[in-house]
A protein has these predicted regions:
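Initiator methionine at the very start of the polypeptide chain
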Residues: 1, 37-38
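Short, linear, compositionally biased motifs with a strong N-terminal bias
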Residues: 15, 29-30
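Outer-membrane beta-barrel proteins and related beta-barrel translocases across Gram-negative bacteria
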Residues: 138, 144-160, 168-196, 201-209, ...
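Bacterial N-terminal signal peptides that target proteins for export
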Residues: 3-24
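Intrinsically disordered, low-complexity segments enriched in proline/serine/threonine
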Residues: 8, 20-22, 42-47, 58, ...
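N-terminal signal peptide c-region/cleavage motif recognized by signal peptidases
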Residues: 32-34
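N-terminal amphipathic/hydrophobic interface segments
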Residues: 38-192, 207-226, 260, 285, ...
């Protein structure tokens, strides 16, 4: 039976339609909602010429009939208010007075808007909107469902009661039971003698019990009084008052505490407090107690906006009981758009701040909770701005910055050299494709970008060395302050096709200095003007590799890519040119195909070098994924490089070491990487790196690594008065992995060993215990640093849907175990998951 009625109780009519075993009722709330067809809205005007607005979608004219428009996805419309929503009733049978008292019997339901009421039988009074539910009562409202033996409530859920309810909250996957439920408003539900958990009834590992729990859907939070936390049915904590979010939205309040043990600080406990200032701003206050040092206060402030974003962090320990002094740290990172588009572009001006500093040399070692943080010895304080010029000057980018350093000396008398401060640096860069690539109407390239490319850059820097606050108390050069101007220019003409490429290039660099030595008797700083010419070229050959299809299980392609790179730079004596920001570039596959063996602006290597290389690739024919890559390269120097970092090279060599690198991805997710550097004059490898990993499925990984470095003999010189014999300086092994021991327990570990010192470098042993609503992690870690061993014991209990308690071993596991994957969190519920 379908029942149409007006909420006011007049002008009602009844339309009977026989339906087997069920009667369906529909209650109209306003006379205007009775089936009155409305003509479609007028079509928008057509686009004017030159307009960028999208063309309208034309809907065929069907006269006075509303036409449904096809759509490619289900859309959630604007919700209808309760006073305008229709009321539906469904049951096996219905009797009573239509406008006064209705009795729905057998699988009864009442639906209105986002409210669904179900029971075996429902007595419903439309005038008062009150329903009495008898047998298997159920109320679904928004993201919550309540079930009990019987209930009395208003259908709009503004008031009512339910006995012995069981409830579920979809967004947080929470559930619980209570002695009684009282519905105070449409959004506030109060439970007496209630429980709360995110566990399933089959695995009730933890739950909260409370005298009273109040769920507020408007504020999207749950509040409770006299709460007791139960773990494996054992009370572990009493909470007089607690508040938890019922959605993913942020909320101010106490976060779970962080606890652990460290051999330097003793027992370490932090109680975070989160402040949700605004949707784009928040603050976390971090009071921290260390049994061997005292109480530290820390904090983190975050902000984000279309034109700016920033993070400010800091810690302050008023009196370190172990060190006998105040300790502090700050870290400020800021991005700011002053003008134009925040993403950059012509006319945009963007600024930034990266500033960090600590109170003393040992602060990172004493207080950092990560390996990377504990070995940090240098902090930057950098402020700058960059802008792309507008209009016809848009090929130019200008910038300015100041940069100072705090260099720590944690291992005195061994010292760390401090770099020069830059106060300030002003740069201007120009780059233009004189003949840009052409493209079709679809935006795809018709011709590759093969036109000439020109570039020009200028750099003015003022270097300063703060001798008074640095150890050692002499500058790394003979100058304590200097001005340097660098001008670079280049013109290149790349030609590229699918089978080959040629890239000729000419460039120059000019350096000029205005510097005074801090001691008399030294020659003034020497500048230079040095040109360079280079030619980079390569070929590409490819064929089907049917013979490898059986090994890899699919069609494969084999390619060979020979490459030749020649560079010529005349020799210019730079023995009297100072060093401010320059060092050796190192030696690897990327460095061997480069113009300069130095990084920075104070040295230009003399070149008459030809580098030859060959790369072979095995790729999947269907996807292009690389399964194996092998590279061989060697450089020949026809005259021998004479320019060195700290002076001229006395006996330059004509041939470089031979480089070999290979990377293989076998079936079964086994990967192997090998790198070797072979010295042809000494007939031995001077550097070897081998790594391998097996990751058959997520959460399973085994890793192996080996590294060996051998240094050839170094003769004494004016810049190195001691010299050194040939020796192996590195010979290290490491093993790591993650593997499940059972369905619920996984083991994580790492072992690093140095065969030269016969010492264990680092050890990690960790266990993860995972259930549907509970994750427990524990880790034991030892790290050998500067002949001192630091021991950590970390533990963490993650109550899913509630929070995390304990120190965070996940970061430690990610850092030590390549491929480590923490236990995945449950998927966020879909808006249709509990669709009624």
């Amino acid at each position: 039976m379908i029942h149409y009625r007006l909420r006011a109780g007049f002008n009602a009519f009844l339309l009977l339609l026989p339906i087997p075993r069920q009667v369906v009722g529909l209650v109209l709330l306003q006379l205007a909602n009775i089936a009155i067809a409305q003509a479609p809205a007028p079509l928008p005007p057509m686009n004017q010429s030159g307009s960028n607005a999208p063309a309208p979608i034309l809907i065929p004219d069907r006269g006075e009939v509303t036409v449904l428009k096809l759509d490619d996805q289900l859309r959630v419309g604007k919700p209808i208010s309760d006073d305008k929503a229709l009321t539906f009733t469904i049951s096996d049978s219905i009797d009573g007075v239509v406008d006064r008292d209705m009795s729905l019997k057998g699988r009864a339901q009442i639906r209105r808007n986002d409210t669904v009421v179900k029971a075996d039988n429902i007595n419903y009074a439309p005038d008062s909107d009150i329903a009495n539910l008898v047998g298997n009562a159920e109320l679904t409202k928004n993201n919550a469902t309540f079930k009990g033996p019987q209930a009395r409530l208003r259908v709009d859920a503004r008031e009512g009661e339910m006995e012995s309810p069981y409830y579920e909250i979809r967004d947080s996957r929470a559930s619980g039971k209570a002695k009684n439920l009282t519905i105070q408003t449409s959004d506030i539900f109060v439970f007496d003698k209630a429980t709360y958990t995110t566990c399933t009834p089959e695995n009730l590992d933890w739950y909260f019990s409370a005298d009273q729990i109040e769920i507020d859907n408007e504020q999207k939070e749950m509040r409770g009084t006299s709460g007791v936390m139960h773990l494996f049915n054992t009370p572990i904590a009493y909470v007089p008052y607690f508040s938890l979010p019922t959605s993913k939205e942020r909320k101010s309040g106490l976060l779970p505490p962080v606890a652990g043990y460290n051999s330097k600080n003793g027992f370490d406990v932090t109680q975070p407090y989160y402040v949700n200032i605004a949707p784009n701003r928040d603050l976390t206050i971090l009071p921290r107690y260390m049994s061997e040092r005292g109480v530290q206060l820390g904090g983190s402030y975050r902000t984000i906006d279309p034109r700016y974003s920033g993070v400010v962090m800091g810690d302050y320990l008023p009196y370190d009981q172990k060190a006998g002094r105040d300790r502090w740290r700050y870290d400020w990172q800021q991005r700011q758009n002053f003008l134009g588009s925040p993403g950059g572009g012509p006319g945009a001006i963007n600024g930034y701040v990266n500033a960090a500093r600590v109170s003393d040399n040992l602060y990172p070692t004493d207080f950092s909770q990560t390996v990377a943080g504990s070995v940090t010895s240098q902090f930057r304080q950098e402020v700058g701005a960059v802008s792309q010029l507008p209009g016809s000057l848009s090929n130019w980018t200008v910038g300015v910055k100041t940069l100072t350093f705090q260099t720590l000396q944690p291992n005195l008398p061994s010292t760390v050299g401090a770099p020069y401060n830059i106060l300030p640096q002003i740069t201007a860069n120009y780059r233009s494709n004189l003949v840009p690539p052409s493209s079709g109407l679809d935006g795809k390239y018709i011709t590759l970008p093969t036109g000439p490319i020109s570039s020009l850059s200028t750099d003015f820097s003022r270097f300063s060395y703060n001798i008074a606050s640095s150890i050692p108390n002499t500058a790394p050069g003979i100058f304590s302050q200097a001005d340097r101007t660098v001008v670079k220019g280049a013109l290149e003409y790349p030609q590229a096709t699918p089978g080959y490429y040629v890239r000729p290039k000419v460039s120059f660099q000019s350096n000029s200095y205005s510097a005074t030595a801090f001691q008399p008797g030294y020659q003034p700083a020497q500048g230079f003007l040095i040109p360079t010419a280079s030619l980079d070229s390569g070929l590409a050959f490819e064929r089907d590799a049917t013979e490898m299809g059986r090994f890899f299980g699919q069609d494969m392609l084999l390619s060979l890519e020979p490459r030749a790179y020649y560079v010529y730079t005349p020799y210019i004596n730079q023995a009297n040119t100072p060093l401010f920001d320059t060092g050796d570039a190192g030696f690897g596959v990327s460095q061997i195909f480069s113009e300069n063996t130095f990084i920075g602006n104070d040295r230009i290597s003399d070149n008459n070098k030809l580098t030859g290389g060959l790369t072979g690739r095995i790729t999947e024919a269907n996807t292009g994924a690389e399964r194996a890559v092998v590279t061989l390269a060697q450089r020949q120097d026809f005259t021998g490089q004479r320019v060195g970092l700290t002076g001229n090279i006395a006996s330059p060599t004509k041939y470089s070491d031979t480089l070999a690198a290979a990377s293989v991805r076998f079936m079964g997710n086994f990967n192997a990487d090998i790198f070797g550097q072979y010295n042809t004059q000494l007939n031995r490898f001077v550097q070897t790196t081998v790594g391998g990993s097996w990751r058959p499925t997520p959460g399973r990984s085994l890793n192996f690594g080996y590294r060996n470095v051998w240094n050839p003999p170094i003769q004494a010189s004016p810049f190195n008065s001691i010299g050194s014999p040939a020796a192996t300086t590195t010979d290290q092994y490491n093993l790591s992995g993650q593997w499940p021991l059972s369905r619920e327990v996984s083991a994580v570990g790492r072992w690093g060993y140095d065969s030269l010192t016969t010492k264990t470098l680092n050890t990690l042993v960790a266990l993860e215990y995972t259930r549907d609503c509970l994750v427990f992690r524990s880790a034991y870690s030892q790290l050998l640093l500067n002949n001192n061993t630091t021991t950590q014991i970390l533990f963490q209990i993650e109550f899913r849907g509630l929070g995390v308690a304990g120190d965070n071993p996940v970061d430690l596991m990610k850092l030590n175990v390549p491929g480590y994957l923490p236990t995945p969190k449950p998927l966020a519920p879909s808006i249709y998951e509990n669709y009624q």
